[in-house]
Amino acid sequence: MKQLLDFLPLVVFFVVYKMYDIFYASGALIAATGLAVAMTYFIYRKVEKASLITFIMVAVFGTLTLAFHSDLFIKWKVTVIYALFALALLGSQWFMKKPLIQKMLGKELILPDLVWNKLNMAWALFFTACALANIYVAFWLPQDVWVNFKVFGLTALTLVFTVLSVVYIYRHLPREQK
């Protein structure tokens, strides 16, 4: 259910973009993301920090897109969010006792520190690559291509990387956790 709520704003953005334009889609994205956060809180009585950060970024960049009637802001939002996630992961690796990935999943999984560090670094590099790919697609290709890349390309890449991460984790789990 939670993943469905997280995915809802993306679907709304895509449908409204195809029916109208990037500006209606940006407004719909703000509303849908706010609704998803509210529903998550209503159902689970908590909202993850990443979801709150995403909502704030959507609200800020979406509002700037509407206020200045420029799609540059909504395009930059994707890059900024991915860059923030990458920086958070890298910062946790270098400045905290445990990598952020371990803090998020360490209660459910027992893995060696080296595995947590590699997994954390892999996700940081993945988010960095997504941020850079978004810059290229958003600013050198037509808007329709960017919307499709944002909705389908980045989503597919994230799903594939998640599956690869699960396989990597599974290979390093103790026998009793498999």
Swiss-Prot record:
It is found in: Cell inner membrane. Its main location: membrane. It is a multi-pass membrane protein. It comes from the Bacteria. It holds the Pfam family IspA. NCBIfam families: ispZ, PRK00259.1-2, PRK00259.1-3, PRK00259.1-4. Belongs to the YciB family. PANTHER family: INNER MEMBRANE-SPANNING PROTEIN YCIB, INTRACELLULAR SEPTATION PROTEIN A-RELATED. This is Inner membrane-spanning protein YciB. The gene is yciB. Coiled coil: none annotated. Signal peptide: none annotated. Plays a role in cell envelope biogenesis, maintenance of cell envelope integrity and membrane homeostasis. Keywords: Cell inner membrane, Cell membrane, Membrane, Transmembrane, Transmembrane helix. One of its GO terms (cellular component) is plasma membrane. InterPro entries: YciB. The chain crosses the membrane at residues 22-42, 50-70, 72-92, 121-141, 149-169.
